């Protein structure tokens, strides 16, 4: 296509949009942002010549690799420890992808720029493609992996699981609240521009090291589209910056979006990379090292900092606090321990840790053993049924954590937990920023300005409250996490498939599960103060 014909085609596509003159359009997806002074910029023109042929070629490579993996016996070589965590990961990730596709009409409706609508429409096609190839990857794993249990229930399990619902909260953030907050700042400016680096670049590297070369093929195909999505987000960001009235909203949304992405994405991807791998080479990058390179340097220093020249206040404090939580406060390791504590209500198996694992963690995170080593030794000791309860019900010096109302990841850095009465309910938050998000950001007014489109953080946000007072065996049965024999649990605290060493419903029966939040709201003020003080001091029950 010649340059002249490309320009004509681009102009013709732009003419396909119109503003109705016979009626006032209904605002389906509202925003508190204003775009009266916004400049026009269309990212689509740069790729219009080659988009569909390019995507076809990428799909051919993905599905060809899937066929090659089966013919090449990849599943005889891949590490079980790695693929077990993919049951959780691949149950979650298609949902944020399809939510991103659903977010594009929100952005199109909110941004009065027919030119940029073209790029957003193409992004919607991308996101549908991403979700499709990820679902196909999951199906291929299910059909060929030695233990398909868990892969066969992911769409149901992700929606009712204590970990999967965190991912659901993350994906729903793309399509709820203010349209620009959700579909642009939270999704495109932060999630796609920053955190897809660890998600779609660093994680595939770890997959390959564990014998899985399918996930890198699929996710590099996904990541190659992200540069265009980043361009869409940046275009809308510049449009918003053109109007000074948007600056407080942008600064609010950057704080919320950065922190919620950190809380959820770093929790999940950090755990998959650090605890799902068998590759313990000393020269392999830890998640902290990956984060410093891919997010701190490539995103914060290269993308966020230059925005200050437009007068925008960047959340430097939150970036530094996220780094501190990963490096000094053991955030990823706390998440992994929490997931392993909840193994009876998992739909994936979690491997025990070995001396090689211990040595690697101590090398990469000095002091790791003194804080986490003894617990993982107890996890190994309590891995098989018969003489003990699941580790969550044994005395191993670990108190089941409170859930954060905002990000829904538990308050695992216990000294930072915030407890406040909001909307008539005592709620717990993992951090001051998550409390601010619920009590200040997602409200009908912000800094004296009406913000009716932000919405509220509502619903059953604490998984534990849904199962308060139930027997553990009944919870597992209600969730449907039972294998085909009707008695053996899908989740196991080891990778041994010997039926004699796998936990059954009878093995976990007799243990009553209680919700920390329900109990917190039942306490007197003095009891609550004492409980919170003990929790912050290290998690020993008051």
UniProtKB/Swiss-Prot annotation:
Top-level EC class as recorded in UniProt: oxidoreductase
Name recorded for this polypeptide: Propane 2-monooxygenase, hydroxylase component large subunit
Disruption phenotype: Cells lacking this gene are unable to grow on phenol, acetone and methylethylketone (2-butanone).
Bound cofactor: record note: Binds 2 Fe(2+) ions per subunit.
Cross-referenced Pfam families: Phenol_Hydrox
Iron recorded as keyword: yes
Domain of life: Bacteria
Inducers of expression: By acetone. Transcriptionally activated by MimR.
Cofactor: Fe(2+)
Subunit and partners: The propane 2-monooxygenase multicomponent enzyme system is composed of an electron transfer component and a monooxygenase component interacting with the effector protein MimD. The electron transfer component is composed of a reductase (MimB), and the monooxygenase component is formed by a large subunit (MimA) and a small subunit (MimC). Requires the presence of the chaperonin-like protein MimG to ensure a productive folding, resulting of a soluble MimA, which leads to the active form of MimABCD.
Catalytic activity, reaction form: propane + NADH + O2 + H(+) = propan-2-ol + NAD(+) + H2O; acetone + NADH + O2 + H(+) = hydroxyacetone + NAD(+) + H2O; butan-2-one + NADH + O2 + H(+) = 1-hydroxy-2-butanone + NAD(+) + H2O; phenol + NADH + O2 + H(+) = hydroquinone + NAD(+) + H2O
Coiled coil: none
Gene3D superfamilies: Ribonucleotide Reductase, subunit A (1.10.620.20)
EC number(s) stated in the UniProt entry for this protein: 1.14.13.227
Entry binding sites for Fe cation 2: 127, 192, 226, 229
Molecular function terms from GO: metal ion binding; monooxygenase activity
Similarity-based family: Belongs to the TmoA/XamoA family.
Protein species of origin: Mycolicibacterium smegmatis (strain ATCC 700084 / mc(2)155) (Mycobacterium smegmatis)
């Amino acid at each position: 296509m010649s340059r002249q014909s490309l320009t004509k085609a681009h102009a013709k596509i732009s003419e396909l949009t119109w503003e109705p003159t016979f009626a006032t359009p209904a605002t389906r997806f509202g925003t508190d942002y204003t775009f009266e002074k916004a400049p026009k910029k269309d990212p689509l023109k740069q790729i219009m010549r080659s988009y569909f042929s390019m995507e076809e070629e990428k799909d051919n490579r993905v599905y060809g690799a899937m066929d090659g993996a089966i013919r090449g016996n990849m599943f005889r070589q891949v590490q079980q420890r790695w693929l077990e965590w993919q049951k959780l990961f691949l149950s979650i990730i298609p949902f944020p992808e399809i939510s991103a596709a659903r977010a594009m009409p929100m952005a199109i409706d909110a941004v009065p720029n027919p030119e940029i609508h073209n790029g957003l429409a193409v992004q919607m096609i991308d996101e549908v493609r991403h979700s499709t190839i990820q679902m196909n990857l999951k199906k291929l794993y299910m059909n060929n992996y030695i233990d398909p249990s868990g892969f066969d229930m992911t769409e149901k399990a992700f929606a009712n699981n204590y970990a999967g619902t965190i991912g659901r909260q993350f994906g729903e953030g793309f399509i709820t609240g203010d349209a620009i907050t959700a579909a642009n700042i939270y999704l495109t400016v932060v999630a796609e521009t920053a955190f897809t680096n660890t998600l779609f670049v660093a994680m595939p590297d770890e997959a390959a090291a564990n014998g899985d070369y399918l996930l890198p093929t699929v996710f590099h195909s996904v990541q190659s589209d992200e540069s265009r999505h980043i361009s869409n987000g940046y275009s809308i960001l510049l449009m918003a910056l053109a109007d000074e009235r948007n600056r407080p909203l942008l600064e609010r949304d950057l704080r919320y979006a950065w922190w919620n992405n950190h809380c959820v994405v770093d929790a999940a991807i950090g755990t998959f990379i650090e605890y799902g791998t068998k590759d313990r080479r000393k020269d392999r990058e830890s998640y902290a090292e990956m984060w410093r390179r891919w997010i701190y340097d490539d995103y914060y220093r290269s993308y966020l900092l230059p925005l200050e020249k437009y007068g925008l206040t960047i959340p430097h404090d939150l970036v530094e606090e996220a780094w501190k939580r990963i490096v000094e406060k053991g955030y990823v390791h706390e998440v992994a321990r929490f997931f392993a504590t909840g193994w009876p209500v998992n739909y994936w198996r979690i491997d025990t840790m070995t001396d090689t694992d211990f040595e690697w963690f101590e090398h990469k995170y000095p002091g790791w053993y003194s804080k986490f080593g003894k617990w993982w030794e107890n996890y190994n000791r309590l891995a098989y049924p018969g003489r003990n309860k699941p580790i969550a019900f044994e005395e191993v010096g670990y108190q089941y954590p409170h859930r954060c109302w905002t990000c829904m990841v538990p308050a695992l850095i216990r000294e930072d937990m915030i407890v406040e009465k909001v909307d008539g309910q005592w709620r717990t938050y993992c951090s001051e920023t998550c409390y601010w998000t619920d009590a200040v950001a997602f409200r009908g007014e912000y800094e004296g300005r009406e913000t009716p489109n932000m919405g509220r953080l509502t619903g059953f946000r604490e998984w534990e409250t849904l199962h308060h007072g139930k027997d553990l065996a009944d919870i597992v049965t209600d969730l449907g996490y039972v294998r085909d024999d009707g008695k053996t649990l899908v989740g196991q605290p080891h990778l041994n498939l010997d039926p004699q060493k796998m936990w059954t419903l009878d093995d976990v029966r007799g243990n009553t599960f209680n919700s920390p939040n329900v109990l917190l709201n039942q306490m007197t003020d003095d009891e609550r103060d004492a409980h919170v003080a003990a929790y912050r001091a290290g998690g020993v029950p008051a």
